[in-house]
A protein has these predicted regions:
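Conserved beta/loop motifs at nucleotide-recognition and modification sites
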Residues: 6, 10-169
Length: 169
């Protein structure tokens, strides 16, 4: 399943696909969430995190943010099996790993156990990079773009959010 290429252009389709994966508990080893729609990236990140890790589980969760990442530490965490959990989750949020980590990072992703999942959140990515191509081939790329958010899509999304709260417009 991890070799399945799933790249969507519209946020709604991405959310549907992520919801399906969560229901089926069929996760990829690596997720790349990107685009100029930060709210949808944040929502997707939280959906995946909440599905894989229980709230407050600090043993099986580590976050690297704002350009601060050490590949040795990342590798150590990626190869550590989860403790009383099905998954170990590593979040790389705004680290620039797609620009800096290249070969060593690809090696980590290729060899880490199926019990480890990495979520990468970057506003912009170079689609020509080796890391991007590896993730596109072996993981999941969700691209959330403002230009794809039509009025119809946004209205349905708002209606769905309100429906969860038992409200209508």
């Amino acid at each position: 399943f991890s070799a399945l290429i799933i790249t969507h252009r519209i946020g709604e389709c991405i959310m549907k696909e992520l919801t399906k994966q969560i229901k089926e508990k069929s996760f990829h080893k690596v997720y790349l969430l990107t685009g100029d729609e930060p709210y949808l990236v944040l929502q997707a990140k939280h959906m995946l995190k909440n599905a894989m890790i229980k709230e407050g589980d600090t043993m099986n969760y580590a976050a690297f943010t704002d350009g601060k990442i050490d590949l040795n530490t990342l590798q150590e965490l990626a190869f550590t099996y989860p403790f009383f959990s099905e998954k170990r989750l590593l979040l790389l949020d705004g680290t620039g790993i797609l620009k800096t980590g290249k070969d060593e990072f690809v090696s980590i992703m290729e060899n880490m156990p199926e019990t480890t999942c990495i979520i990468i959140c970057e506003p912009e990515v170079d689609k020509r990079s080796k890391v991007y191509k590896w993730i596109k081939k072996n993981g999941y790329v969700g691209e959330f773009l403002k230009k794809n958010q039509t009025e119809k899509v946004l209205l349905r999304w708002i209606a769905a959010l309100l429906g969860k709260e038992k409200k209508q417009i």
